[in-house]
Curated annotation (Swiss-Prot):
GO molecular function annotation: calmodulin binding
UniProt family annotation: Belongs to the IQD family.
Record field: compositional bias (Basic and acidic residues): 319-329, 414-463, 481-500, 585-597
Motif (Nuclear localization signal 1): 264-271
GO cellular component: cytoplasm; cytoskeleton; nuclear envelope; plasma membrane
Region described as Disordered: spans on this chain: 1-31, 268-379, 407-597
Entry protein name: Protein IQ-DOMAIN 29
PROSITE patterns found in the cross-reference section: IQ
UniProt keyword terms in alphabetical order: Calmodulin-binding, Cell membrane, Cytoplasm, Cytoskeleton, Membrane, Nucleus, Repeat
Signal peptide: none
Keyword Nucleotide-binding tagged: no
Gene: IQD29
Length: 597
C-alpha cells in the first residue's frame, strides 16, 4: 500500500482546501512572547542622555483604570504602537482557535474511515489466501496422483519386459539341453536325465511351473553351465558316482559298531550294579551280631560313611513310629502324671553326670577283676562320648515340630552306642596296658572316699542308662514331650536296683557266670538288665527298649541265659510288630529268673 499521509492532509486533499500560513501566525507568536516577557523599547543614544533619572513605571494589563501614571512622551508613543499590534494579534488568535477545533474533528472522522477501510481490506485478503491454499492443495494432490500412476505404469512395464526375457531364455535353454542330450550323452545317461527333466518338456501345462521358471534365473541344468570336458559336468560326475558305489552296504562297519555298543552297555550296567551293592551294604542299619567279625566290619563301615547310616536309621525310626502310633497315643495319656514326677528327678541330676561316672568306675575296679574293670573303663568312655549327642538330641526335640524331630536323635544315639561298644571290644594289648596303669592311679585316689558316696554315685550313674533306654523305648510316642519321655522309666529302675542291690553292689562274679571267649561279642547287653526292668504299665502295654549302651558299669548282674534272651528280644523289636509280644514274654521269664536268684 505504501506510505500513507497524515489524516488531516489526506482529508484536505480530498476536500480541495489548502492550508495557508500567513503573517497572522507570526503575529500570534510575537503576542505570546509579549505576554510572557516585558516590552523592550529601543532608544537612540542622543535621547538616552535627556531622559530623567527617575525610573519609568511600566504598568501591566492588570492595573486598574483609575490609577494615573506619569510617563514620558516617547514611552507613550511606543505604547500606542504596541496597543495597535495587540489588537491585530487578538483577532488572529480567535481565528486560529476556530481552525484548530475543526482540524481535530476532521482528524477523528478520518481515523474512523481509515479503520473501516483497512478492516475491509484485511477481510478480503484473508479470504483470498484461503482460496489460494485450497487451490494449491487440489493441484498438488492431482500432481501426486499422476506421478504415482506414472511410476506404477513404468514399473509394471519393466516387470513385463523382464518376464518376457526370462521366458525366452528358459525356452532357449530347454531346446539346447534337448539337443545336447541326443548328441553327447549315452543311453544310460539319457534315460536318467529324461526321467529327471521330463516335467520340463511342456511347462505350459502347469501354471505354477511356468511362474517358477519365469521368476527364478538359475533354472538351467548342470550341463549348460559346464562343458563336457569339465569334471563337474553331468556325464563325468555320473561315472565317478558309479565307481564309488555308495549304495553298496558296508558289512564290516556294521559288525564293528554292534558289539561296541553292547560292550558299553554291559560295562555300564555292571558298574551300576556294583555301585548299588556298595550303597546297599553301607546303608544297612547296624544290628546286633553274634560274632566279633561282623561287629568289626560294621564299625569300619560306619566310620567311613556315617551320614548314610544315620539317614537309614532315621528312616527306620520313622517306619517304626507309624506302626506304634496307635498304641502310644493310648499309653501316653494315662502315663503323663508318672512322667512328670520322674522329670523333676532328672533335671537335678543332669549336671554332675560325668564326674560321678569316674568315681563309680574306680570303685567298681577295686571290687571286680581286672578284665571286668577294663571293660567298664571302655564302656564308660563310650558313654562319655555319647553325652554331647544326647544333649543335642534334647535341643532338637524341644523344637516346635516335636513329633517329627524326636525320631532322629534317638537313632543316632542308638547307632553310636553300637559302634562304640564294638570298637571297645577290638582293643589291642598296648591299649589294655595303658588302661591298667590308669586304673591303678585311680585306685589310690578313690580309696580315700567313703562307701556312702560311692553308693550314691553309682545310683546317679544309673540314671543316664535309664534315660537312654527310655528314649529308645519311646521313639514312636508323638503326643508326649521328649523331656517327659526320658523321665518315664528312671523311677522304676531305681526301685528295682534297690530290691536287687545285693547282686550289683559288691558281690564277685562266680565261675559259671564269668564271660567266656565266645560271649565277648555280646558284651553290649550286660550293661543294664532292660528286660528285668521292663514291667507292664497301667494300660497293659510293655515298653520296647533299644540296645543298651552299657554305661553303668555293671557286668556281673545277668546270667548267660538272660543275656541271650536280651539279645533275642532286641533283634525282634527292630524287625516287626510280632516282636512286641515275644519281647513281653521273654521279659516276664527273665524277671522270674532273677527273682529266683
Amino acid at each position: 500500500m505504501g506510505k500513507t499521509p497524515s489524516p488531516g492532509k489526506w482529508i484536505k486533499s480530498l476536500l480541495g482546501k489548502k492550508s495557508s500560513k500567513s503573517s497572522l501566525e507570526k503575529g500570534g507568536e510575537k503576542l505570546r512572547s509579549a505576554k510572557k516577557e516585558e516590552l523592550v523599547v529601543k532608544v537612540k543614544d542622543n535621547n538616552v542622555s535627556k531622559l530623567p533619572t527617575e525610573p519609568p513605571v511600566v504598568s501591566s494589563q492588570e492595573v486598574a483604570a483609575t490609577q494615573t501614571v506619569v510617563v514620558p512622551d516617547v514611552v507613550i508613543a511606543e505604547k500606542q504602537l504596541s496597543g495597535d499590534i495587540e489588537g491585530d494579534e487578538s483577532s488572529n488568535v480567535n481565528l486560529e482557535s476556530g481552525n484548530d477545533s475543526e482540524e481535530v474533528k476532521l482528524e477523528e472522522a478520518a481515523t474512523k474511515v481509515q479503520a473501516a477501510l483497512r478492516a475491509q481490506q484485511a477481510r478480503e485478503e484473508s479470504q483470498n489466501l484461503k482460496g489460494i491454499t485450497r487451490v494449491q492443495a487440489v493441484i498438488r494432490g492431482h500432481l501426486v496422483r499422476r506421478q504415482a500412476v506414472a511410476t506404477y505404469s513404468c514399473i509394471w512395464g519393466i516387470v513385463k519386459v523382464q518376464a518376457l526375457v526370462r521366458g525366452k531364455k528358459a525356452r532357449s535353454s530347454e531346446t539346447v539341453a534337448q539337443l545336447q542330450k541326443t548328441n553327447t550323452e549315452t543311453e544310460t545317461s539319457e534315460t536318467l536325465q529324461g526321467s529327471t527333466y521330463s516335467w520340463m518338456e511342456n511347462p505350459t501345462k502347469l501354471s505354477m511351473i511356468d511362474k517358477l521358471l519365469v521368476s527364478s534365473p538359475t533354472t538351467l541344468p548342470l550341463k549348460i553351465q559346464y562343458s563336457p570336458e569339465d569334471p563337474n559336468s553331468a556325464k563325468v560326475w555320473l561315472g565317478r558316482w558309479t565307481q564309488l558305489q555308495v549304495w553298496a552296504p558296508g558289512p564290516l562297519v556294521v559288525k564293528n559298531l554292534v558289539p561296541k555298543s553292547q560292550t558299553k552297555k554291559r560295562s555300564f550296567q555292571a558298574v551300576e550294579a556294583e555301585k548299588g551293592k556298595l550303597k546297599r551294604g553301607v546303608r544297612k542299619p547296624t544290628g546286633v551280631s553274634t560274632t566279633a567279625n561282623s561287629s568289626t566290619s560294621r564299625s569300619t563301615a560306619d566310620n567311613e560313611k556315617p551320614k548314610r547310616t544315620v539317614r537309614k536309621a532315621s528312616t527306620l525310626g520313622k517306619e517304626l513310629s507309624k506302626i506304634e502310633n496307635d498304641k502310644s497315643k493310648q499309653s501316653s495319656r494315662k502315663s503323663t502324671s508318672a512322667i512328670k514326677e520322674g522329670s523333676s528327678v532328672e533335671v537335678k541330676d543332669e549336671k554332675p553326670r560325668i564326674s560321678h561316672k569316674k568315681a563309680s568306675l574306680s570303685n567298681g575296679i577295686g571290687k571286680a577283676t581286672r578284665k571286668s574293670a577294663e571293660k567298664k573303663k571302655e564302656i564308660a568312655d563310650a558313654v562319655q562320648k555319647e553325652l554331647p549327642i544326647e544333649e543335642v538330641s534334647v535341643s532338637l526335640v524341644d523344637a516346635p515340630e516335636d513329633e517329627k524331630m524326636n525320631l532322629i536323635p534317638v537313632t543316632i544315639s542308638k547307632e553310636s552306642d553300637l559302634d562304640k561298644d564294638e570298637k571297645s571290644l577290638v582293643l589291642d594289648k598296648p591299649e589294655q596296658d595303658e588302661l591298667r596303669t590308669a586304673e591303678r592311679d585311680d585306685k589310690a585316689e578313690e580309696e580315700l572316699k567313703t562307701a556312702e558316696r560311692d553308693d550314691s554315685a553309682e545310683e546317679k550313674i544309673q540314671e543316664p542308662d535309664a534315660q537312654i533306654s527310655s528314649e529308645n523305648g519311646n521313639v514312636a510316642s508323638e503326643n508326649t514331650k521328649p523331656s517327659d519321655r526320658r523321665a518315664s522309666l528312671p523311677a522304676k529302675i531305681e526301685n528295682h536296683h534297690q530290691d536287687d542291690g545285693l547282686t550289683q553292689s559288691g558281690r564277685k562274679i562266680p565261675s559259671y557266670m564269668a564271660p567266656t571267649a565266645s560271649a565277648k561279642a555280646r558284651i553290649r547287653g550286660q550293661g543294664s538288665p532292660r528286660i528285668a526292668q521292663e514291667k507292664p504299665e497301667k494300660n497293659g502295654t510293655t515298653r520296647r527298649h533299644s540296645l543298651p549302651p552299657a554305661a553303668n558299669g555293671k557286668l556281673s548282674t545277668m546270667s548267660p541265659r538272660a543275656h541271650r534272651l536280651l539279645i533275642a528280644s532286641a533283634k525282634g523289636s527292630m524287625n516287626s510288630d510280632r516282636s512286641f509280644s515275644s519281647s513281653k514274654d521273654i521279659g516276664d521269664k527273665s524277671t522270674k529268673a532273677e527273682w529266683k536268684r
